[in-house]
Curated annotation (Swiss-Prot):
This is UPF0434 protein CbuK_1382. Belongs to the UPF0434 family. InterPro entries: Trm112-like (IPR005651). Pfam families: Trm112p (PF03966). GO terms for cellular component: cytosol. It comes from Coxiella burnetii (strain CbuK_Q154).
Length: 56
């Protein structure tokens, strides 16, 4: 994930910062506890494409 791209992307729901998870290939919104998938290097930022984060 390009660092410059990560700096300008925001959660489409709360407009908060996203964190890149290299292991899962996802962008994480910690506020909403949602994960946005990355397919072939392209973040899928559609609210319907999210998965809820499970607290560990």
């Amino acid at each position: 994930m390009d660092r410059r791209l990560l700096e300008i992307l925001a959660c489409p729901i709360c407009k908060g910062k996203l964190v890149y998870s290299q292991d899962e290939q996802e962008l994480i919104c910690r506020f909403d506890k949602l994960a946005y998938p990355i397919h072939d290097g392209i973040p899928v930022m559609l609210p319907d494409s999210t998965r809820p984060l499970i607290e560990r």
